[in-house]
């Protein structure tokens, strides 16, 4: 039975082994010594926590003992912990003799900030993966937090040579471009499985779904992400479709298969049970995605893991249907989507899943469960909420990250220290420093609809029609005795200009102009000038009146002339009024006479009027 299971399983996954696997890479920049300075490619390990979206600078150390890191460094009295003021330590380790993950764990225990595994032979880079469940208890896997990278044998030998020559090797690991970040939305997919009896990997996967659900739903509801779950299936070779093994692991006559959960056909659930539950989860997503609520999928799969485990013999349709109903999902639509697993026909949902397994563009074939793909790049690292969220947040275009990406757990707010080296106006509490997931940006801000312009580092200035509303446009402003003057003008001009009655740069100061002292106003012989803040007062002696527009004093003679002029003006106005009334009276009289004549003419056609003589004319007819 075990041999038959092994043979069939081998045939089922043979097509995947022949698939196109893409090694996810990041850059490694050697900054010293000059002999090996340059940028190199390295492969990201599929464990630990790669610093997606960030960089890590350190000094390389090649231990004199335990160079393959298969034993604890404490046995050799070796520590890689950095001393205060020094760069973190990158440990160079040789490949071979033990698992990659064990090397990383041992180096981390000794204080390493990252490990570089030098390949033992000249070959293309490969992905360092976690060991199979049956080959290692791997209790330490989830505790690995340092990043790891596989480098070529050539680069490894060059680093060793430089270190043996007494050179200090410094380098920078760069993950800023490991995940594409084209726009403000991240598209990601999770290749998962409903099977909960596959050991530690299944336990880790279920734990991740539970922990990540909240963040995933926040991002999806906010329109920040587009999530799609996927499920790996295999087809049974045609020669084996009628075999007992194929019938127990496949549905739809061998088209869609999954391995037996317990690796034993005689007990527990079969592989076909897993395929059906995977299909049900995929259909739940499709139904809810059509209703505009794709995030309900997370509620369903986490509830299913809790309420319908294989260990309690609840991994059934009845248990699943109960959850579907409790979440308000249309059960009929889900059942229609699932179709008949016994029918000799293709299932459109699972057929699409098999086609999606094949890599496109920069994404390789999906061959590992679970697999996370972010912006069409396969994620490498620990399947843990913080690590995955870090990778996803690196997929947003700079300055478009949602708030969840800017928490202290995920990134360091560089604006908190020295304002990130950017411009700021402490009085108005305005800064050009913008915290992003990849680091700070110095960009002049827009505040209350007012755009600031400048380089963002040394200066930013409010501009536009409303710029005076923000810190007075950066211009001078002062109030005294109930009067306020400002050098800011609410138009599209950018310059500060002292108002009339002041002089200065308009930015830091505007000083009152003493018009009296400068003799620019109030200069007539009878004038008496008194300077005020922002203006002046001018009075006249001997009871004269001051005319500001002419800067002169008017005496009594001039007043008499003025009175005469006003008298003439009134006479003229009265004369015009009388002429107007007379004209109106004549007009009314003529109109009335004209109307009387017209009316009399009309009436005369019908009857004799007293003032009209008899009509003596007539018509005669001879008889």
Swiss-Prot record:
Residues 51-163 form the PA domain. The keyword Chloroplast does not apply. It is a single-pass type I membrane protein. Glycans are attached at residues 143, 289, 429. Residues 587-623 are cytoplasmic. Residues 411-461, 464-511, 512-554 form the EGF-like domain. SUPFAM superfamilies: PA domain (SSF52025). Gene3D superfamilies: 3.50.30.30, Laminin. Residues 23-565 are lumenal. InterPro entries: EGF-like_Ca-bd_dom, EGF_Ca-bd_CS, PA_dom_sf, PA_domain, VSR_TRX. Its main location: membrane. Disulfide bonds join 415-433, 422-442, 444-460, 468-488, 475-496, 498-510, 540-553. The tyrosine-based internalization signal may be involved in trafficking at the trans Golgi network (TGN). This is Vacuolar-sorting receptor 1. It comes from Arabidopsis thaliana (Mouse-ear cress). The lineage of its organism: Eukaryota, Viridiplantae, Streptophyta, Embryophyta, Tracheophyta.
């Amino acid at each position: 039975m075990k041999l038959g299971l092994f043979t069939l399983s081998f045939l089922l996954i043979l097509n995947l082994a022949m698939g196109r696997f893409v090694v996810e890479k990041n850059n490694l920049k050697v900054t010293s010594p000059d002999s090996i300075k340059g940028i190199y490619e390295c492969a990201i390990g599929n464990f630990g926590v790669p610093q997606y979206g960030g960089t890590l600078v350190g000094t390389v150390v090649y231990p004199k003992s335990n160079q393959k890191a298969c034993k604890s460094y404490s046995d050799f009295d070796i520590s890689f912990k950095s001393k205060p003021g020094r760069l973190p330590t990158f440990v160079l380790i040789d490949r071979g003799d033990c698992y990659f993950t064990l090397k990383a764990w041992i180096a981390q225990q000794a204080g390493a900030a990252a490990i570089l595994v030098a390949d033992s032979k000249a070959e293309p880079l490969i992905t360092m993966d976690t060991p199979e469940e049956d080959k290692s208890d791997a209790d330490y896997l989830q505790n690995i937090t340092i990043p790891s990278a596989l480098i070529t044998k050539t680069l490894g030998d060059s680093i060793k040579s430089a270190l043996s020559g007494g050179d200090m090797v410094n380098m920078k690991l760069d993950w800023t471009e490991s995940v594409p970040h084209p726009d403000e939305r991240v598209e990601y997919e999770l290749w998962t499985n409903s099977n909960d009896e596959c050991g530690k990997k299944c336990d880790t996967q279920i734990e991740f779904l539970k922990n990540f659900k909240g963040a995933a739903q926040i991002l999806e509801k906010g329109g920040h992400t587009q999530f799609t779950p996927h499920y790996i299936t295999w087809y049974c070779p045609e020669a084996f479709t009628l075999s007992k093994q194929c019938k127990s692991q496949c549905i739809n006559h061998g088209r869609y298969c999954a391995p037996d959960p317990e690796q034993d056909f005689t007990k527990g659930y079969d592989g076909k049970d897993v395929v059906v539950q995977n299909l049900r989860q995929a259909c739940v997503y499709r139904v809810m995605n059509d209703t505009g609520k794709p995030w309900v999928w997370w509620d369903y799969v986490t509830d299913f893991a809790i309420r319908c485990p294989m260990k309690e013999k609840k991994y059934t349709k009845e248990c699943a249907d109960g959850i579907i109903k409790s979440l308000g999902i249309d059960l009929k639509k889900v059942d229609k989507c699932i179709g008949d697993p016994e029918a000799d026909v293709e299932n459109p949902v699972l057929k699409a899943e098999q086609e999606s397994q094949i890599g496109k563009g920069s994404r390789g074939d999906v061959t590992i469960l679970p697999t996370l793909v972010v912006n069409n790049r396969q994620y490498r690292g620990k399947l843990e909420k913080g690590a995955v969220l870090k990778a996803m947040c690196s997929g947003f275009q700079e300055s478009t990250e949602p708030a969840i990406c800017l928490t202290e757990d995920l990134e360091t707010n560089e604006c908190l220290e020295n304002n990130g080296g950017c411009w700021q106006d402490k009085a108005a509490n305005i800064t050009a420093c913008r915290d992003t997931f990849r680091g700070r940006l110095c960009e002049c801000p827009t505040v209350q609809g007012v755009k600031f312009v400048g380089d963002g580092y040394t200066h930013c200035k409010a501009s536009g029609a409303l710029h005076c509303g923000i810190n007075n446009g950066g211009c001078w402003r002062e109030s005294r005795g109930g009067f306020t003057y400002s050098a800011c003008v609410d138009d599209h001009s950018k310059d500060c200009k002292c108002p009339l009655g002041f002089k200065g740069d308009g930015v830091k100061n505007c000083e009152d102009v003493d018009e009296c002292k400068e003799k620019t106003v109030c200069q007539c012989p009878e004038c008496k000038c008194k300077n005020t803040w922002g203006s002046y007062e001018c009075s006249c002696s001997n009871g004269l009146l001051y005319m500001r527009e002419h800067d002169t004093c008017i005496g009594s003679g001039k007043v008499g002339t003025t009175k005469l002029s006003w008298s003439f003006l009134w006479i003229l106005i009265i004369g015009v009024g009388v002429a107007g009334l007379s004209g109106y009276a004549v007009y009314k009289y003529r109109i009335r006479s004209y109307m009387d004549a017209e009316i009399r003419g009309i009436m005369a056609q019908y009857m004799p009027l007293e003032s009209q003589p008899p009509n003596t004319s007539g018509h005669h007819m001879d008889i």
